[in-house]
Amino acid sequence: MFAEYGVLNYWTYLVGAIFIVLVPGPNTLFVLKNSVSSGMKGGYLAACGVFIGDAVLMFLAWAGVATLIKTTPILFNIVRYLGAFYLLYLGSKILYATLKGKNSEAKSDEPQYGAIFKRALILSLTNPKAILFYVSFFVQFIDVNAPHTGISFFILATTLELVSFCYLSFLIISGAFVTQYIRTKKKLAKVGNSLIGLMFVGFAARLATLQS
């Protein structure tokens, strides 16, 4: 399938893309958190931020920016530390609000949808490993002798985005159903938010220690 467009072993790629999307990460966790705290609208706004951020990174990977980042340690480190700092900021903010026992119910009635989208977009864009991954993964399924490798790259990128959309939609819908139950169990909600905050801090530490 899509062999005429320079795509090699498309079905193998699709299976690989599914497994990759299923691996939990900060983007997935952020979408799930917002679907629980702000409903389906908040979840899909977070997902849109992730999709746009990923699309930008994929385009940059195709444009050759990945090679620049890989061969320029300073640039890689700048993006890496910015991403780690932002993850730490999000995690600390969640933990502070949870431990402080702020009036989350009042805030949940009027979610800041614009802020959700912006945070998801920044979270996606400040992951230097993602752009390097796209190149290393996609290149295995592109015929370098094809006349238009850009089309091949576009097909693979679109497939990955569609798989991600399906999975995130499942999480968003599930999170929206869980919302009503969580709101009646304040202790459970507090524990859940604390775990999410700690996971973001953990993601920050991991990103800060990554090597190019």
UniProtKB/Swiss-Prot annotation:
One Pfam family from the record: LysE
Transmembrane segments: 12-32, 49-69, 71-91, 122-142, 153-173, 188-208
Keyword terms of this UniProt record: Amino-acid transport, Antiport, Cell inner membrane, Cell membrane, Membrane, Transmembrane, Transmembrane helix, Transport
Membrane-protein topology: Multi-pass membrane protein
InterPro entries linked to this entry: LeuE-type
GO process annotations (BP): L-leucine transport
Keyword Cell inner membrane: yes
GO-annotated molecular function: antiporter activity; L-leucine transmembrane transporter activity
PANTHER family, alphabetized: ARGININE EXPORTER PROTEIN ARGO, LEUCINE EFFLUX PROTEIN
Family to which this protein belongs: Belongs to the Rht family.
Name of the protein this chain belongs to: Leucine efflux protein
